[in-house]
Curated annotation (Swiss-Prot):
It comes from the Eukaryota. This is Dermonecrotic toxin LspiSicTox-betaIE2ii. The lineage of its organism: Eukaryota, Metazoa, Ecdysozoa, Arthropoda, Chelicerata. Its main location: secreted. Its cofactor is Mg(2+). It comes from Loxosceles spinulosa (Recluse spider). Dermonecrotic toxins cleave the phosphodiester linkage between the phosphate and headgroup of certain phospholipids (sphingolipid and lysolipid substrates), forming an alcohol (often choline) and a cyclic phosphate. This toxin acts on sphingomyelin (SM). It may also act on ceramide phosphoethanolamine (CPE), lysophosphatidylcholine (LPC) and lysophosphatidylethanolamine (LPE), but not on lysophosphatidylserine (LPS), and lysophosphatidylglycerol (LPG). It acts by transphosphatidylation, releasing exclusively cyclic phosphate products as second products. Its EC number is 4.6.1.-. CDD domains: GDPD_like_SMaseD_PLD (cd08576).
Amino acid sequence: FALAHMVNDFDIMKSYLDEGANGIETDITFSPEGEPESAFHGVPCDCKRWCDRTVSFDSYLQKTSDLSTPGHPDYRENLLIIILDLKLNGLSQDALANGGRRLADKLAAHFWTGGRRDQRATFVVSVPQTSQKVFMKTFREEMEAIGMGDMNAKVGFDFTDNGDVSVTKAVYDELGITEHIWASDGITNCVALLFRGTSRLEELIQKRDEGESTYISKVYAWTYDKETSVVLALELGVDGVMTNYADFVISILNKPEHSSKYRLATYEDDPFERFKAV
């Protein structure tokens, strides 16, 4: 997966999809009560990026619904995965719980109500810290409560705190989440990968490849903009690279030394199916 980073308005969304990105990551802000409000990152953000792009969350969901619906004039077949980077830090536990319910309500309203089941997008609900696990809990409960339990097939989960892998697994076990888990490791593009290292990324890949006992479906690295970093990630066996330059990552993927091993994912590929690094 070539995952376009910080896709917070429609102009940049079109640009990245034109480049060939098959996934987008969007920053979602919340009110103090836990209501999803807008796609917005703000400063600071990645180097060489405009931090203040924004649209309302409802507008964002309507647009991505149109883009992922076959037969719609705006349909883009390469939009496969939408990572919702949820800006939850500072919210109370009550607000987090409300936020999980409200996100489920809004996804259902824009994508799946009224018998609509043909949208092709898959979501990753990306929570900053394991201490905010109640958000995932209430999201899943609300999906069942509103009769959308079958649509959990289109939803995955991710914690982005670069935390201890065993602690993260314990939290997923507590929540009863045993599949559809995307695991990530990374750092802003303003800091060289040299300073971050890849030891945790390698640990995630190893855990993914352990067999039926593993809890990880996919592993992605962020935010990789340099060729050396992208090549290293591919050599390690990641499932996705989040980047500010989707066309650049795709061009590396298409080089002969990589295309024999990798290809860009399509709709026929299950975003939650586990593939081992070879």
